[in-house]
């Protein structure tokens, strides 16, 4: 039997069973369309989920938080561990966001230090990693590890709304004029600018320690703003209201305060209870470390 005979036989059968043929064709078309629609819905769902997760933060960043209670076998999240992480494949950058446990001081600006804010919002980071971590700048540039501004001058980067942290110390705590808040407007609906222009006004970080006799010791450092972050809480809090300096500079300040106060680095006083046993937090390295990889699939 030739191929032409097979084709003729098939055609004749289809013509004799027109209803069945039509239903078969409709079934094939509907089934194909259903498969295409389901695949499309699956792809769209994946894309939507990835977009939703991306809105919460950078999917190529891994956050490592330090667990420092109890388990002695937990590796310390220190500089040695960070270097091991940097050596892994696909790792683009690694940096801790370091905050010392014991650093008493304030940031001053204005005549006679009229405007002030605390140092609790200061973080230390690896200067070679910040730009690679994908932070956006509203103004200025990233500081570098070899940047030198002179003796007792520290380059810093601030969040977009950092200036709103300053308070007017000449106003009472009950005064509505002691602090200007982000988004605050005047009677004409115009935005009220903060007391301090961080890009123009001088800012001084003052370490202070008061001994048992009530005598205060201080040491001052000039802060020079080299860059301002675009506010993005999905990347980190400090992009809005915090301050970042080089890790080495923050550790230098920590050592300077220890020398000023005559004390050693204070251990954390944090405790937790597990299985009825009270455990004190141990000094197990940095509190948080961020790792940037080259691709979300890695």
Predicted segment positions?
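Basic-flanked hydrophobic alpha-helices used for secretion and membrane insertion
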Residues: 76-87, 92, 101-114, 120-124, ...
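N-terminal, intrinsically disordered, polar/charged segments of Gram-positive cell-envelope systems
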Residues: 51-83, 87
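N-terminal Sec/SRP start-transfer signal
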Residues: 1-36
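Residues that line or immediately flank small-molecule/substrate-binding pockets and catalytic motifs
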Residues: 98
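N-terminal plastid-targeting presequences
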Residues: 23, 118-119
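Alpha-helical transmembrane segments
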Residues: 33-62
């Amino acid at each position: 039997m030739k191929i032409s005979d097979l084709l003729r036989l098939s055609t004749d059968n289809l013509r004799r069973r027109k209803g069945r043929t039509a239903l078969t064709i409709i079934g094939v078309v509907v089934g194909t369309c259903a498969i295409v629609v389901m695949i499309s819905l699956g792809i769209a769902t994946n894309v939507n989920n990835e977009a939703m997760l991306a809105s919460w933060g950078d999917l190529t960043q891994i956050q490592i938080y330090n667990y420092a209670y109890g388990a002695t076998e937990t590796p310390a999240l220190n500089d040695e561990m960070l270097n091991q992480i940097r050596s892994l494949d696909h790792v683009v950058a690694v940096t801790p966001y370091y905050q010392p446990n014991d650093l008493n001081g304030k940031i001053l600006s204005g005549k006679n230090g009229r405007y002030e804010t605390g140092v609790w919002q200061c973080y230390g980071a690896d200067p070679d990693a910040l730009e690679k971590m994908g932070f956006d700048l509203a103004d200025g540039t990233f500081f570098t590890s070899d940047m030198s501004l002179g003796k007792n001058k520290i380059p810093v980067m601030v969040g977009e709304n950092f200036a709103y942290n300053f308070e007017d110390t000449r106003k009472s705590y009950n005064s509505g004029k002691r602090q200007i808040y982000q988004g605050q407007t005047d009677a004409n609906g115009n935005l009220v600018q903060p007391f301090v222009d961080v890009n123009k006004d001088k800012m001084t970080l003052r370490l202070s320690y008061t001994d048992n006799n009530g005598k205060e010791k201080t040491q001052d450092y000039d802060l020079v703003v080299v860059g301002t972050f675009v506010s993005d809480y999905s990347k980190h809090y400090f992009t809005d209201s915090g301050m970042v300096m080089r890790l080495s500079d923050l550790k230098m300040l920590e050592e300077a305060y220890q020398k000023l106060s005559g004390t050693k680095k204070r251990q954390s006083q944090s405790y937790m209870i597990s299985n009825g046993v009270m455990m004190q937090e141990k000094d197990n390295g940095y509190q948080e470390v961020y790792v940037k990889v080259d691709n979300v699939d890695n």
